[in-house]
Amino acid sequence: MGWTAVLLLCCTLPAQGLIRIPLQRFSSVRTELRSAELLESFLRDHQPDVFARKYSQCFPPRLHTLRLGWTSEKLYNYMDAQYYGEIGLGTPQQNFTVVFDTGSADLWIPSSYCVSEACTRHRKFKAFKSSTYTQVGKVISIQYGTGHMLGIMAKDVLKVGDLVVTDQEFGESVYEPGFTFVLGQFDGILGLGYPSLAEEVDSPVFDTLMAQKKVTQPIFSFYLSRKKSSANPEGELLLGGVDEALYTGPIHWVPVTQKNFWQIKIDSIKVQGTSTFCTTGCQAIVDTGTSLIGGPTGDIILLQQLIGASPTSMGEFVVDCVRVTSLPQITFTLNGVKYPLPPESYVRKEVISGQEICFSGFQAMEMSSRQGPLWILGDVFISEFYTVFDRGQDRVGFAPARQTGEWGS
């Protein structure tokens, strides 16, 4: 049976037999920097390109590359990542917390030989304890701001959920710079982008799962809850299918326009029903590795004005928490289907020094694609819509996500 036939069948099958990876929601690095009173200095040193740095491989506004005679790669920016899950590497298994990131395609974790401050605060892979470990012999350099990460490539047994694959290539970092990894509550990154996005691994993790026939269908899906509940998952990555209990209505599909990031076309973006942005269409990357929605600077500044957001000294935008429920709805139209974002989705509430502050979930970035202006649809969008990534038919699907309190309805 071909992938197409299997995919048609999968949309009507229950979720039994599929592989679930629970995702936990933690404070982002941005929040940790703010709590440590370090955010202002970090943004001063790294703005305006904290967003651009992640996507510079395919959409370079400027080049951030360090070459040391070995393979060179850009280090992705994860200061807004919030949802993490567990994987296991080696024999016997060593566990790590990772960002499952559709905006990258490589897998890396800290090495036991790493002595950077960031590594001392995270679990480190002990290669000498794994009987199935193989060193590839390639040194990697990953650029980040004014510093760089160094590492080596290796292969070992990888466990994701209940799935086990052999000879998965991954990077072991031996030097990690910057506050992003010191304060991050994740050990490493597991990329779920297309193979063309990977600069280091020959076969990204999901490609290995498909090649070794570990998933019945070439799809994976994300559920990210906006609300914490002891009875229901904060988030879930499902490998090989979808879980109908986590969304309502049908899944609507949007074709991938460029196979590296999960890039799709936006028809339009409207604020309270008025067509304001992308009136002639634009492009978007669906990215589980950031919590924000990013867009062109001019559009984002206008959007902040339309929702009544005011700038802070650190380049962020805040709204009056009392007014959140009266803020306008923002609607993204994708492949003819409207996806409305209520203010409860695009406003992030944080308590700082005992005071509740409401931050806008939109952030400016300066990049474009050959097909038009570029937006980033991060967790602000994905938490509102159950999101399915289909490698078999190169498309992304969306359906309204069930929120806490809607279960069993």
Regions inferred by a protein language model and the residue ranges of each:
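Disordered propeptide/prodomain
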Residues: 1-98, 106-109, 113-150, 211, ...
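Aspartic protease catalytic domain
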Residues: 2-36, 40-45, 92, 100, ...
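Aspartyl protease active-site motif detector
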Residues: 83-128, 158, 189-193, 239, ...
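Short strand-coil-strand connectors
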Residues: 88-94, 145, 159-166, 218, ...
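Aspartic protease
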Residues: 112-164, 302-339, 343
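Short, solvent-exposed loop/turn segments enriched in Ser/Thr/Gly
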Residues: 151-155, 186, 279
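Extended, H/D-rich, highly charged conserved domains that either
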Residues: 194, 214-240
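Flexible, small-/acidic-enriched active-site or ligand-binding loops
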Residues: 232-281
